Swiss-Prot record:
Signal peptide bounds: none
Family membership noted in the UniProt record: Belongs to the MbcA/ParS/Xre antitoxin family.
Function, as annotated: Antitoxin component of a type II toxin-antitoxin (TA) system. Neutralizes the NAD(+) depleting activity of cognate toxin Res.
Entry's Gene Ontology molecular function annotations: DNA binding
Designated name of the protein: Antitoxin Xre
């Protein structure tokens, strides 16, 4: 069994900052999400992470056709779609922190079935807020050395 030794290295460039969120949570972010995120945020996430555009949209539960319509229309996601993208950003930042800033390892972990999640992938849990909380709670348990 491998032993996890946490380091307290803080990400110098978290995803939430890269995509232009004022913070990772709070009333200002909530107002931005309710207004609708610009569709260009998907490109920013893709450039920062190792996830492709299709993967990001799938994980966020946004159909490619809806994305295409948003691109040719107002250029913004709906409030609901924006919340789902923010959920992905939040969880991905926590996963990258878990792996001490290694985005590749975090992405691999997100795609692997995890025992602590009932042998489903963390990315598949992001379709609901409670699933995302389960993933973030698992990350917290791992960071604190609680076997999951």
């Amino acid at each position: 069994m491998r032993v996890f030794t946490p380091s307290h290295k803080v990400q110098s460039n978290p995803l939430w900052r890269t995509v232009g969120f004022p913070s990772s949570s709070g009333p200002h972010l909530n107002a931005i999400l309710n207004e609708g995120l610009p569709v260009t945020i998907v490109d920013k996430i893709q450039n920062w992470s190792t996830f492709g555009k299709g993967d990001i949209l799938r994980i966020a539960g946004i159909q490619i056709r809806s994305y295409s319509r948003r691109c040719s229309g107002k250029g913004k996601f709906t409030a609901d779609e924006s919340q789902r993208i923010a959920r992905f950003v939040r969880v991905m930042d926590h996963a990258v922190d878990l792996f001490n800033g290694d985005k590749d390892k975090a992405a691999q972990w997100m795609k692997r079935p995890i025992r602590g999640l009932g042998y489903v992938t963390p990315e598949s849990m992001l379709d609901t807020e409670s699933g995302a909380l389960d993933v973030m709670n698992l990350i917290g348990r791992i960071e604190h050395g609680i076997v999951s």
